[in-house]
Amino acid sequence: MTEQKKTTIGITGMTCAACANRIEKNLNKLDDVEANVNVTTEKATISYNPESTSADDLTKTIEKTGYGVLNETAELDVIGMTCAACSNRIEKVLNRTDGVDQATVNLTTENATISYNPSATSVDALIKKIQKIGYDAQPKKEVAEKSSQKELELRSKLVKLIISAVLAAPLLLTMLVHLFGIQIPSIFMNPWFQFILATPVQFIIGWQFYVGAYKNLRNGSANMDVLVALGTSAAYFYSLYEMVKWLFNANVMPHLYFETSAVLITLILFGKYLETRAKTQTTNALSELLNLQAKEARVLRDNKEQMIPLNDVVEGDYLIIKPGEKIPVDGKIIKGKTSIDESMLTGESMPVEKVQDDNVIGSTMNKNGSITVKATKVGKDTALASIIKVVEEAQGSKAPIQRLADVISGYFVPIVVGIAVLTFIIWIAFVQQGQFEPALVAAIAVLVIACPCALGLATPTSIMVGTGKAAENGILFKGGEHIERTHQIDTVVLDKTGTITNGKPVVTDFDGDEEALQLLASAEKGSEHPLADAIVNYAQTMNIKLLDTTDFEAVPGRGIKANISGKNLIVGNRQFMNDENVDIKDSEDIMTQFEKSGKTAMLIAINQEYRGMVAVADTVKDSTATAIKQLHDLNIKVVMLTGDNERTAQAIANEVGIDTIIAQVLPEEKAAKIKSLQTQDKTIAMVGDGVNDAPALVQADIGIAIGTGTEVAIEAADVTILGGDLLLIPKAIKASKATIRNIRQNLFWAFGYNVAGIPIAALGLLAPWIAGAAMALSSVSVVTNALRLKRMKL
């Protein structure tokens, strides 16, 4: 009898003991299963017989009951992939593995991202699965470490290329004889000389192609290595056969193809070297983000200052940062004041004043004051680390546009081998009957011109460069699907407060004398209302001395009453003044004017006498009007969503040029309003910054979070714009359009190259070495085209 297996599964969605009991009951109905579900720990402890019940059965039972299984994500560096057929093969094997929810393998980044159930499989088991099909894998390395590894790989490829080129160059001269009849020294035509030069290229330099081909064929698949190994081996061994015949009849000089095999391998190595070199440039955005980090920190330990590596800083450490130094980690100022350049995060060039208890962000620059900071977030929890993580995930993700290329790549190599065999048969049977050499040359040309690499690189390289360029501009796409969908947007919905406006009310107008302002600010200083803060701040900038208040009373929906230094103050709306019998007829015109401008106007009366008026408004961001104009230039409709009344909303809409307003919307109604717009066949982007925007961000086709907003909004969004600059919204759409256009160009070239190249080779119109050169350069051209995105202007 099989021994019972024990596992623990994390469960999401449980709210009470009844949930746990329901899951437990359904699990225990399975054969040979004993389950215990704990609602507090949100875990199920299960003993089961793997012969009668699989780990997947357990997961499906929990999900059918209406709850979720908590998966973990593994990120692996995959070693040994050469083309799209490799990445597709690994992806298929991983997705068929028990316990794996979803796996994606990216040829460009050479990464695998796997969502899996830890109760059913493990990272070690996943690595073994990859190794079993002929590749290698390891837990993902840090960007800096991987970058240095890539440099070593590039150097190794260059050495191989140089050796191969030195050996193949003399053989290339023999082509001049075949093509143009040019006379060269007889040594170059000697079969032994050609054999000695071609053999190390074929079996030492080119051994990697044999290893790759063997591993793939052993596992029932085929990749680029199979095509190269078949094509070059056919040329090499046919030449060897002709050479052996020559040994027995030295009077007849054989027609050898040693130069074909050696030059083909050299050209393919050259293409792979250029491709690797270009691919390293696609990760520059990540390297540049990493370079923003401080390398070390000045920490206060045992009452002594000491410099330590950044990685040694722990939460709770006290850091001393001097003028001109980078803030090492996220933290809170506990001593000192300064101004900080946060442009790397917000794009705002003006330094921000910081005082005690203010938060600071790691990697920003301290400008002019010494400060002591308590570390609150270190390592992978810092703001910059989060940004790097988002960019990495986006660069490693797949866009839906890639699906067709993935499907074709899976069948590509077997089809090409079939076409090569068919070409050989047609040539030897019909085109040049009984002539072996022309048939072989045409078949070799078909094998070596076909390039699955270009298909595999077409989308991910563009995604990598596009998301990297966007990140440099403060735009974070969370994945390839989001960068693809963003270019389809035709309507942008903007939340008003904190998105269109600064989110902080200020006094815009004051009509009254100094005493009225003094009493007004004195009464408001104890209030927590945002409008009160605006009034107090205004009075302080005017150097008004605040007085003590007695008998303060807030009247809901009306205003406030207070007694200050024996004077009775009344502040509020028209109705309040009428209730208190204050004559306000002189204020009507100016108050109406303020309200039409979207401002909140408050009347001031002292001892029953009207003394003035204050207008407070949440001011519009400087960039809002320009951003909306740019969206209109892109033929995108702009809608404002706000809880304000119609008149206030319309005033702001008129100021910034917004097409449509949806006013008096409660926070919980925002998602429903987005859904209503979607029923009109609109592709909606919702832009917001607050907790109450999160449901609407999720409902929208694309949710865009303002980076200065709450973590909840940022988590719910598909795109994050760092800082509060709305100009980044049209830039995000432009980046998406440029990236998708670039992907389409790459796919057109990759498909077009193979569709045109294979028939031309089959017709015998291409020499194998020319076909090989075309194949080598096709993938390089795709990567080079993607690199053009680095120069796109947003």
Curated annotation (Swiss-Prot):
It is an enzyme of class 7 (translocase). InterPro entries: ATPase_P-typ_cyto_dom_N, ATPase_P-typ_P_site, ATPase_P-typ_TM_dom_sf, ATPase_P-typ_transduc_dom_A_sf, HAD-like_sf, HAD_sf, Heavy-metal-associated_CS, HMA_Cu_ion-bd. It is found in: Cell membrane. GO terms for biological process: copper ion homeostasis. Cu(+) 1 binds at C16, C19. Involved in copper export. This is Copper-exporting P-type ATPase.
